[in-house]
UniProtKB/Swiss-Prot annotation:
Family of this protein: Belongs to the CBP4 family.
Claim: Coiled coil is one of the keywords in the record: yes
Domain of life: Eukaryota
Spans through the membrane: 8-24
Name of protein: Assembly factor cbp4
GO cellular component: mitochondrial inner membrane; mitochondrion
The keyword Membrane is assigned to this record: yes
Subcellular location: Mitochondrion inner membrane
Pfam families: CBP4
Length: 72
């Protein structure tokens, strides 16, 4: 039984170390965007607006599929 507990503790330690290393070294999405050059950042923002508009249209289409009676 002692070996099982020891193995579990070591396993949790190894996985925990890997997880903490990932969390500490991976930048946040905002940090990545802020580190972009101005021209790429402007392009990213423009594409982000286009994506949000497209998602809005897709959401409207899905709503129309679910509730066809609401169509005018």
């Amino acid at each position: 039984m002692n070996r099982v507990v020891k193995s579990i503790v070591y396993g949790v330690g190894i996985v925990g170390f890997g997880y903490m290393t990932m969390k500490l070294t991976t930048p946040s999405p905002e940090r990545v965007v802020n580190s972009l050059p101005p021209d790429l950042r402007a392009s990213y923002e423009m594409n982000k607006k286009d994506r949000s508009q497209a998602e809005g249209v897709l959401r409207m289409i899905e709503d129309a599929k679910r509730n066809p009676k609401n169509l005018v």
